[in-house]
Design a protein with these regions (language model features):
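Acidic, mature catalytic/reactive cores of soluble proteins
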Residues: 1-174
Length: 174
C-alpha cells in the first residue's frame, strides 16, 4: 500500500506532463499498439481484481507474441491519455483513503501500509497491540493520498505512538 501512493503520484505527474505537451500543441502520443488496452478506464475495471488480471494477462500474451523490432505502434489521443492516467491516480488514492484507513479506538487514525504473507493488514490494533509504521504515512502525505484531516490525524498518531524523546525523535515503527 505504501508504494501505491507513489504510483498514484507518478500517474498524476505523467498526466501533468502530458497537459504541458498539450498546451504546446501536441495532440497525440505514439505508444506500442499492445499498450492501448492499458489505458482502459472505469470503476468496473478498477474494482475488479479479476478484470485487472485478465487485462494484464492479455497484455503479457501480446508482449510474448511480438518479435523484437516488429512492435506495431499506434497513436493515442493526448486527452484520452491524460484522462486515463488521472482517473487511475484518483481511483488509487480514493481506494486507499477508504479501504486502508485504520483507527485505534482512542481517536487516532493512520493508513495501513503493508500486508503480511497471508493477506492480513499489518497496521492497526491487533490483539490489543497497536502497530504503526512511519514510512507508509510519509508516502501517503507526500504523494497527496492523505487529505488534510487525515494528515493531521497521522501527525497526532505519530506523536502518540512513534515519538520517543529518549531516542531523540520518531521511531520508524511501534
Amino acid at each position: 500500500v505504501a508504494f501505491t501512493n507513489a504510483y498514484a503520484q507518478n500517474l498524476e505527474d505523467l498526466a501533468g506532463l502530458l497537459r504541458i505537451a498539450k498546451e504546446r500543441g501536441i495532440n497525440s502520443i505514439v505508444v506500442a499498439e499492445r499498450m492501448i488496452p492499458l489505458f482502459n478506464m472505469g470503476a468496473d475495471l478498477y474494482d475488479s481484481v479479476e478484470k485487472k488480471h485478465e487485462l494484464l494477462q492479455s497484455f503479457l500474451e501480446n508482449c510474448v507474441t511480438e518479435t523484437a523490432g516488429e512492435t506495431k505502434q499506434a497513436a493515442l489521443g493526448i486527452e484520452e491519455c491524460i484522462a486515463s492516467l488521472q482517473e487511475k491516480a484518483d481511483w488509487m488514492r480514493g481506494h486507499i483513503r477508504t479501504q486502508e484507513w485504520v483507527e485505534d479506538g482512542a481517536g487516532h487514525g493512520w493508513f495501513n501500509s503493508y500486508y503480511d504473507n497471508h493477506g492480513n493488514p499489518v497496521e492497526g490494533n491487533h490483539d490489543g497491540d497497536t502497530r504503526m509504521m512511519l514510512t507508509g504515512q510519509v508516502f501517503a502525505i507526500m504523494d497527496k493520498t492523505a487529505d488534510e484531516n487525515q494528515a493531521k490525524a497521522i501527525a497526532d498518531s505519530a506523536d502518540a505512538y512513534l515519538y520517543d524523546e529518549q531516542a531523540g525523535g520518531y521511531r520508524l515503527n511501534t
